């Protein structure tokens, strides 16, 4: 299976996403695989048997969101210089979303930009983080506030890597699949309601459909100037939750699941979404053991955290809210008291 992202503008940044077992990757320049110890221990041998390159280096970064920062980026860039990579060299991001974001950002700034390839190894990164060219690091003010749009040259999605994925991380990836269905495709949502993603064929279809939906949006709006903002459904709340908990309590997909439930509650209270549809979405998330509640200790403080998000512009909070399953609205007209009312409902879970 193959999905194509058409980004032919003044510079062709189009690329293919291959959703099949990796057969071979042939490269003609120095190449560095960037990974973490866990992925390397489980899958590096498998990947090395598929890659041909004149010079191949392995760079291992510490595992986890805590290390998605300037210090780790500097370490990675230093290793690229140590190995004498140049502007013709290629980086391979081999891991989950953190590795993909870090490697992509390093590729965007190393010698003013070099090519990179995404080989995502988690469900969440396969259906979301590896597609679309968003790269970056976190800082003390929030998530992904330092970064760049830098498209990969190709993405290889191989479900072989999911065989060793813990159940919790699998469920976190399902949250992003549900997100795509709720925002863009009612038929896909109904299909998800009826089918079990733990079955291999169902999982492959869900990955393909999610990637197709995201690819179509990225092709229309590469740099998030308009419709691509719809992909942030659930994320406005999720990023505050992650920031408040120091990125330790929830996986990203878990925070997004809670964020979707919060966004749905806001949509119900503003008359956009029916209570029945909100419950359908919540029930689907719970079927995969995803959290759907977060204890908001201080609604006013939570509200102020929205303004640290890069999606907030001119002191205005934009929300992506479903107005039906498969349809959405992007709005900046929600009043503070409406938001606070929703947050108060989450003071106790």
Swiss-Prot record:
Per UniProt, the cofactor note for this protein states:
Binds 1 divalent metal cation per subunit. Can use either Co(2+) or Zn(2+).
> Which terms are listed as keywords in the entry?
Amino-acid biosynthesis, Aromatic amino acid biosynthesis, Cobalt, Cytoplasm, Lyase, Metal-binding, NAD, Nucleotide-binding, Zinc
Q: State the pathway, as annotated in the record.
A: Metabolic intermediate biosynthesis; chorismate biosynthesis; chorismate from D-erythrose 4-phosphate and phosphoenolpyruvate: step 2/7
User: Where does this protein chiefly localize?
Assistant: cytoplasm
Residue positions annotated to bind Zn(2+) are 176, 235, 252
Q: Which reaction does it catalyse?
A: 7-phospho-2-dehydro-3-deoxy-D-arabino-heptonate = 3-dehydroquinate + phosphate
In its UniProt record, which GO terms are filed under biological process? Answer: amino acid biosynthetic process; aromatic amino acid family biosynthetic process; chorismate biosynthetic process
| Summary of the function given for this chain in its UniProt record | Catalyzes the conversion of 3-deoxy-D-arabino-heptulosonate 7-phosphate (DAHP) to dehydroquinate (DHQ).
Q: What is the name listed in the Swiss-Prot or TrEMBL entry for this protein?
A: 3-dehydroquinate synthase
What organism is recorded for this protein?
Answer: Nitratiruptor sp. (strain SB155-2)
The gene that this protein is the product of is aroB
């Amino acid at each position: 299976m193959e999905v194509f992202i058409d980004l032919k503008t003044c510079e062709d940044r189009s690329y293919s996403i291959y959703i099949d077992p990796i057969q071979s990757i042939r490269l003609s320049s120095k190449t560095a695989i960037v990974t973490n110890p866990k992925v390397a221990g489980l899958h590096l041998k498998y990947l090395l048997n598929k890659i041909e390159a004149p010079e191949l280096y392995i760079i291992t970064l510490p595992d986890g969101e805590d290390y998605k920062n300037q210090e780790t980026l500097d370490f990675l860039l230093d290793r690229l210089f140590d190995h004498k990579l140049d502007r013709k060299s290629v980086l391979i991001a081999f891991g989950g979303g953190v590795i993909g974001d870090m490697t992509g950002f390093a590729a965007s700034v190393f010698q003013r930009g070099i090519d990179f390839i995404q080989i995502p190894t988690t469900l969440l990164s396969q259906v979301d983080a590896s597609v679309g060219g968003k790269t970056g690091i976190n800082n003390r003010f929030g998530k992904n506030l330092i970064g760049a749009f830098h498209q990969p040259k190709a993405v290889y999605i191989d479900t072989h890597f999911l065989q060793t994925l813990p159940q919790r991380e699998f469920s976190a990836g399902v949250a992003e699949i549900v997100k795509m269905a709720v925002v863009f495709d009612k038929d896909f949502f109904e299909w998800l309601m009826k089918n079990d993603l733990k079955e291999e064929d169902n999982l492959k279809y869900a990955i393909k459909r999610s990637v197709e939906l995201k690819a179509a949006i990225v092709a229309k709006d590469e740099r998030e100037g308009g419709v691509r903002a719809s992909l942030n459904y659930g994320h406005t709340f999720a990023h505050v939750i992650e920031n408040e908990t120091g990125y330790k309590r929830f996986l990203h997909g878990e925070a997004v699941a809670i964020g979707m439930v919060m966004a749905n509650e806001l949509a119900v209270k503003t008359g956009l979404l029916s209570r029945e549809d909100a419950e359908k979405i919540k029930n689907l998330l719970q079927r995969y053991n995803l959290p759907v509640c977060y204890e908001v200790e201080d609604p006013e403080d939570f509200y102020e955290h929205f303004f640290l998000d890069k999606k907030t512009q001119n002191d205005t909070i934009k929300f992506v809210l479903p107005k039906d399953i498969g349809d959405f609205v992007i709005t900046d007209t929600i009043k503070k008291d409406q938001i606070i009312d929703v947050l108060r409902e989450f003071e106790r879970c």
